[in-house]
Swiss-Prot record:
A Pfam family: PSI_PsaJ
Disulfide bonds: none
Stated name of the protein: Photosystem I reaction center subunit IX 1
Domain of life: Bacteria
UniProt main location, coarse: membrane
Alphabetical GO biological process terms: photosynthesis
Family: Belongs to the PsaJ family.
Keywords, sorted A to Z: Membrane, Photosynthesis, Photosystem I, Thylakoid, Transmembrane, Transmembrane helix
Membrane topology: Single-pass membrane protein
Length: 45
């Protein structure tokens, strides 16, 4: 398993970008699931 992380294709830009975007989307989704009011807070006048 650890040898997988040392391979050249795993450190390439598309793979790193895909993992980064997936983690960011997951964090945003989970944050909005637990604190949904902050999603619409700036829109309330």
């Amino acid at each position: 398993m650890f040898q997988l992380f040392r391979t050249k294709w795993f450190r390439s830009a598309p793979v790193v970008a895909t993992i980064w975007i997936t983690l960011t989307a997951g964090i945003i989704v989970e944050f909005n699931r637990f604190v949904p009011d902050l999603l619409f807070h700036p829109m309330s006048f």
